[in-house]
Amino acid sequence: NPYNSQYTRGLEDSTISGFGEMQTRLKVNIWGNDSGSSAMAIMPFIKFPTNAEELENDDVEGGVTVPIGFKLPMDLNMGFMTEFDFNRNAAEDGYHTEFINSITLSHSIIGELSGYVEFFSNITDGDRSEWIGTIDAGLTYALTKDIQLDAGMNIGVTRSADDFNPFCLYFY
């Protein structure tokens, strides 16, 4: 992320700003993509610690994402995603694996505006790991072929998930 600003609210409010980490990824289409009723890709990625102090960790991390998408009747789209992340552990003495999965159902509302619902799951192989599960809903708007706005709410359905996490993002 080129520039980050994190605001934390608690006993003492704080704001941290600066240059974020840099991630590079490669997308290999297995089938589909621009045409057809389904698509699948494999996307390995690696994160480099180019961030300002305290914004992120200072470690190289990476993983692989496998998204699969289907066009359904009535202009519905369904997506599945599996991801394996190899991240530095909290003690900073090794790495752990995170297993991330999601299933998404989306529908065009009008023009370039679409809505979606999603179930998200994150399980870590660490000793004290807890399952994070959320039900998410949001809107996406395609500004151009390569730029998309995304706003919504993630609602935790497990104890370790945040109760509510509103978000507003842009992708390019």
Question: Predicted regions: what is each one?
Answer:
Residues 1-172:
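Transmembrane beta-barrel domains of Gram-negative outer membranes and organellar outer membranes
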